[in-house]
Amino acid sequence: MSGLEGLMRGRVVLVTGAAAGVGRGVAAAFGAAGAVVGLGVRRPEAAAETAGDVERAGGTAVVLRCDVTDAEQSAAAIEQLVAEHGRLDAVVHNAVSGRSNEATDFEHTDLGEWEDHASVTIRATWRLATQSYPHLRATSGAYLLMSSPAGIEGSERAPFYSAVKAAQRGFVRALAREWGPDGIRVNSVAPLAISPALENLAVTEPERVARITALVPLGRLGDPETDIGPPSVFLCSDEARYVTGQTLVVSGGRFTGL
């Protein structure tokens, strides 16, 4: 990813849900751009491979215990990153409910599932924004949410996931207006990419994954590091200094009317 080289050099970024999938790929891309990358994970040992990716790409990895449903943990992760590296330039909230890996018909959903999705996606989106705001204001930084096409057009057997991702999109639009005068940009990326959820689906319903892939004009699902990472880095860099309040759909052409 030579095009990213130096794009975030001297910058400090927090990526939540960085242990696997899109989060791992995005973290590696920020490493390739020269950033210090805080890897927010529930279990620090789970971030070992991601940390290696970041370091090999040319960045600096900082593993942080950061369960985004725990207010004290997320606050401590942000403060540790700032204390050790002096600043915070971007937050990428990528963490999702572990139950997003499950395809569930609406009639089989329950309140516990809803609360889990809401806690990780909606409440944590607000909480991370609140906790990072003074640091992002100091650096004229960026707040990036990892949304989903499901939050725009809906997804069968994922009603709660679709709902919370739609809420994130509205949050982006509102917060971009409010934080703009402070120099903070707020955007989201809606990727169609290889993820733990799709990997699980490939085992349980391979024909469904084949149908999804067949609908992508570019003929494949996105790679988290090389397809989703660069647009995410761009939106957090000075190259996107006049872009805010937007959702960038990165889907290989699958979703062209969103």
Where are these regions (language model features)?
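Short C-terminal tail/terminal secondary-structure segment
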Residues: 2-4, 103, 153, 232-233, ...
